Every structure is written in structure tokens, then in C-alpha cells.
């Protein structure tokens, strides 16, 4: 999301409560808020597409449709070719939506019923077309005002057909409040949803715009508060991670700093044939400033790990009991453990995890460390499951986790006192009694082998310096995502996990400069 947005994310219930408070104030009514919303959306449309000669609003039957009717009236008054295609006849509307439709029609806005057999089209039609374009001015931009934030059931006809027409129009799309068909709480698509280029959301930033499939469908998000007072900070349950939080979580270095102050990290992993995962985690810990990183791995993996000369390597015996005994000695002098990258799922791995648990050290549990049955992880630990691992921890399925990621995070927090990072597009970070966080940065290049190992190592490296599992997790998630963005801007596809690790210092420098 390139635009600067507030950090607070609100549920539908919280937004409705704010709206009720605003309407209780003297001199404010529903039509006033509707006019403010329409004006904000019109201003954003003209800013985003300054050459637009007009727009067509697809209006549904509720207040979201009312916003659309009002926007058409304001657009007409501004000299644009603004038109309405409605799925619910204006004479059947109620309240503010009815008043907005009446105002729009009185202003001379052309309004016709949506015809699913014709769709929207891009051919010149009765509304006229500029010479040589073949596209009617009113089709320069399509405005989605079909469904608002209250939808919780799958989209039905005729709205579903109107959404399909918008998505197949080939025109720029601006959505009002949320893209129609997207759950404003979970970010789940309810059968079918509008794919918007820009979404102007009203009063507050909704959680569903950043959760799940929300970012894919919302496009660039802009907020119009409509002069409604924000929710008190003590009532906020979700926030998006911003640069200020990250900056505060990165320990500053004095000019006379030495490596001993960077903390000692032990990576436990690198089973036979899986040296790369442990090495990536170790490199990431170094890249964020850890003072010393030791990789405890299988003897067969030691040479591959040692190819990174800055890493210390401790080969472990093949015998599980002997390996666990040796590992306990190493953990006794470590400040932080990162367990799981390339660890494996055999008795050797299980014995090492037992030693990790017995050490009591702050620990990042990742990858194979999350495969085995896990009792309640304590508050000094960080769990980093991807959706499949989260499903295993919860005894569910990946599809259920992805259908409602915030609910999955809450379920994990019910079971563990640890910080939990639910990885994926829009990674979530939570811990009991804290405001949960969502990362709105990142790029699909992060969906590559080894990037999770890099994230685990980065968390461990920051934790070794700060001693704060929460701050380390929040900062590492954001830095990891930002590193991916920076590389994607330069290289596009084909970015390797090792390159993500190498880009972490630049991401840190960037946030520390701002």
C-alpha cells in the first residue's frame, strides 16, 4: 500500500459504533456523512485519473449504493459525464439512499437498470464517445457501489452478475468503502468480489482490506474519515505494522559497540541434506546484527554451512542422545535459539528439540520444530507457522486457516503464551494481551524456498540484541517484507532467499533514516 494509512484497523462492529457516535452529534445526519463520502471518492477519482471525462456508478440497494448515487450527482455538478446503472430501482430505496438517489435524478444524472445480458461494454453508446477512443466518457472509470461492509453471505443475483460485468469491463475501477463481495472483517471473498484498482474506505481502515484476499481485491487503499472521531486507542484490537514501530524495535548501536553486545544465537537445524535452511537462518541473524551465530547441525551439513565464513559451526553426533547432550552444552552459552530450519522429523531431531525446551532460553520455533506435538509455548518464545503448519497445530486444514486468518491466529494464541507469527501474504503477529499486528508490506517474490528460514533467523538475531520477543517479531516481519519489495523492484521474479537475507541491512538502514 503506497499511501500512508493510519495504523489502527477496525472491525465492522467498531466502524458502525463510530458512525452511531458521529450521528448522535448535533448537526450531523446520515445524508451529511453520505455527501462527505461521495465527495471524498470523487476527489480521489479525479486525482487518480485526471484525464477521466466521466464515470459510471453501479449502485446497489443499501447505503453503499446511496454513496454511489450521491457521487454521481456531485460528479455531474463538477461537469463530468456521471451515470448510474442500478440493480435496485431508486423508488424502492429507503432512508439516506433514497434521498441521495432523488438528488442525483433531480441533478439530471442518467440512470438505467443494470442489464446482465449487455454487461457494461466499452463500445460507444447512447452516452456518447470522444472521437477516436471508441469508449464512452462515462466508461472512463467504473465505480463500485453495490455492496457495503455488512455482507457476510455469498453474493447472489443480480449483484453477482454486476460484479462479473465490472471485472470483465477492462476499465479502471474505484470501489466505495470495500470492494463488493469482500468480507470487511476477514478479507474473504464471498463467492465473487470486485477487483478494484483503488478503494476509498470511509471512517476507518477495515481489517478485511488487509487480511486474507483483501489486498488482492482492494488495490490501492485511501481513507476518508468523514470527520468522524477515531476509536480510542484502548479499544483498538488490530494495527498494521508501520515504520515507527520497526524503528523503535531495532536496538541502536553506540559508536563504541562491540560484537558481544549483539548477542549469541544458536541455530538448531541443518539435518542431513538440509544444510541450506540452517545456513539461511544463520545468515539472516548476522544480517540484522547478531554478534555471534553458531549453527548446530548434522556432521554431513557442516561443510555447506561453514562455506559462509562468518558462521560458526558445531557438528552434532548422529546418536540422538549424544547429540542432545552436546547441544545442551552449546545452548548453555547462547542468548537465543532458532530451532527448526532443516531440522528434520526423525528421532535425532526430536532429541534436539527436547534439549531446546529444557534450556529455557528464548527460542524461535520454526519449520520442523512445529511438526512435533507442542505443549504451550512460553512467553519468551516466538512461533512462526505458515498456514499448513498452523493447521497442524490447530488440528484443522490449511483452507480453514486461510479462510479466516485472524481467527486462526486467535486460536493459536489461546493455546500458546508465545508470540505467534502466522506467515503468508499479510503476515499476522499476535500475543496474548497485546494489540495484534498485520504486515501490509511484501511482494510475491517472498513465496520462495528458504524465505521462512530467513525470517526465523532475522527474528532470532533481533531478539538476541533486544531481549524483546514481541518487538523482534514485529520488526523482523516488516524488514523481511520490505527487503522483498526492494529486490522485486530491481529484479522482478527469481529472487532467492539468500538475496532476501542480504537485503535486510538496506531495509534496516532505510527505516532508521526515516
What is each PLM-predicted segment?
Residues 99-102, 106:
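Conserved nucleotide-cofactor-binding alpha/beta core module
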Residues 140-141, 146-236:
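Internal gly/pro-rich beta-alpha loop/helix module
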Residues 109-113, 177:
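A conserved beta-strand/loop element that lines the FAD pocket in flavoprotein oxidoreductases
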Residues 1-88, 94, 98, 118, ...:
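Small-residue (G/A/S/T)-rich helix-start motifs and N-terminal tracts that mark the onset
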Residues 112, 116-137, 435:
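Intrinsically disordered, low-complexity terminal tails and inter-domain linkers enriched
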Amino acid at each position: 500500500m503506497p499511501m500512508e494509512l493510519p495504523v489502527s484497523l477496525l472491525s465492522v462492529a467498531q466502524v458502525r459504533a463510530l458512525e452511531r457516535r458521529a450521528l448522535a452529534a448535533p448537526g450531523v445526519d446520515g445524508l451529511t456523512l453520505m455527501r462527505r463520502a461521495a465527495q471524498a471518492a470523487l476527489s480521489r477519482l479525479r486525482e487518480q485519473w485526471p484525464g477521466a471525462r466521466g464515470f459510471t456508478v453501479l449502485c446497489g440497494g443499501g447505503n453503499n449504493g446511496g454513496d454511489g448515487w450521491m457521487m454521481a450527482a456531485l460528479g455531474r455538478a463538477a461537469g463530468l459525464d456521471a451515470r448510474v446503472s442500478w440493480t435496485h430501482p431508486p423508488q424502492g430505496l429507503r432512508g439516506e439512499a433514497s434521498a441521495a438517489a432523488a438528488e442525483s435524478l433531480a441533478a439530471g444524472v442518467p440512470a438505467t437498470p443494470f442489464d446482465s445480458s449487455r454487461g457494461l461494454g466499452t463500445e460507444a453508446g447512447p452516452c456518447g464517445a470522444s472521437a477516436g477512443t471508441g469508449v464512452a466518457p462515462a466508461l472512463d472509470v467504473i465505480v463500485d457501489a453495490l455492496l457495503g461492509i455488512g455482507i457476510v453471505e455469498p453474493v447472489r443475483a443480480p449483484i453477482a452478475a454486476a460484479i462479473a460485468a465490472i471485472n470483465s469491463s477492462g476499465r479502471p475501477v474505484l470501489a466505495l468503502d470495500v470492494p463488493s463481495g469482500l468480507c470487511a472483517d476477514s478479507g474473504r471473498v464471498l463467492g465473487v468480489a470486485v477487483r478494484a484498482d483503488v478503494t476509498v474506505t470511509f471512517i476507518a481502515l477495515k481489517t478485511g482490506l488487509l487480511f486474507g484476499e483483501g489486498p488482492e481485491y482492494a488495490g490501492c487503499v485511501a481513507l476518508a474519515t468523514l470527520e468522524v472521531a477515531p476509536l480510542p486507542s484502548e479499544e483498538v484490537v488490530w494495527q498494521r505494522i508501520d515504520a515507527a514501530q520497526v524503528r523503535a524495535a531495532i536496538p541502536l548501536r553506540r559508536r563504541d559497540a562491540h560484537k558481544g553486545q549483539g548477542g549469541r544465537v544458536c541455530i538448531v537445524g541443518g539435518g542431513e541434506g538440509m544444510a541450506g535452511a540452517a545456513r539461511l537462518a544463520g545468515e539472516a541473524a548476522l544480517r540484522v546484527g547478531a554478534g555471534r551465530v553458531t549453527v548446530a547441525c548434522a556432521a554431513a551439513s557442516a561443510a555447506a554451512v561453514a562455506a559462509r565464513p562468518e558462521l560458526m559451526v558445531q557438528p552434532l553426533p548422529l546418536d540422538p542422545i549424544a547429540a542432545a547432550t552436546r547441544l545442551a552444552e552449546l545452548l548453555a552459552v547462547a542468548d537465543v535459539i532458532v530451532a527448526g530450519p532443516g531440522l528434520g522429523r526423525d528421532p535425532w531431531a526430536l532429541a534436539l528439540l527436547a534439549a531446546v525446551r529444557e534450556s529455557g532460553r528464548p527460542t524461535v520455533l520454526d519449520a520442523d520444530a512445529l511438526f512435533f506435538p507442542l505443549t504451550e509455548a512460553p512467553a519468551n518464545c516466538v512461533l512462526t507457522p505458515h498456514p499448513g503448519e498452523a493447521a497442524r497445530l490447530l488440528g484443522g486444514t490449511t483452507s480453514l486457516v486461510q479462510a479466516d486468518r485472524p481467527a486462526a491466529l486467535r486460536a493459536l494464541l489461546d493455546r500458546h503464551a508465545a508470540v505467534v507469527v502466522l506467515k503468508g501474504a499479510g503476515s499476522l503477529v499476535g500475543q496474548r494481551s497485546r494489540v495484534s499486528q498485520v504486515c501490509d508490506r511484501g511482494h510475491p517474490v517472498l513465496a520462495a524456498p528458504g524465505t521462512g528460514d530467513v525470517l526465523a533467523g532475522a527474528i532470532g538475531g533481533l531478539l538476541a540484541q533486544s531481549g524483546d520477543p514481541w518487538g523482534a517479531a514485529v520488526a523482523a516481519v516488516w524488514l523481511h517484507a520490505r527487503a522483498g519489495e526492494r529486490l522485486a523492484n530491481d529484479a522482478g521474479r527469481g529472487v532467492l532467499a539468500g538475496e532476501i537475507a542480504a537485503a535486510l541491512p538496506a531495509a534496516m538502514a532505510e527505516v532508521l533514516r526515516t
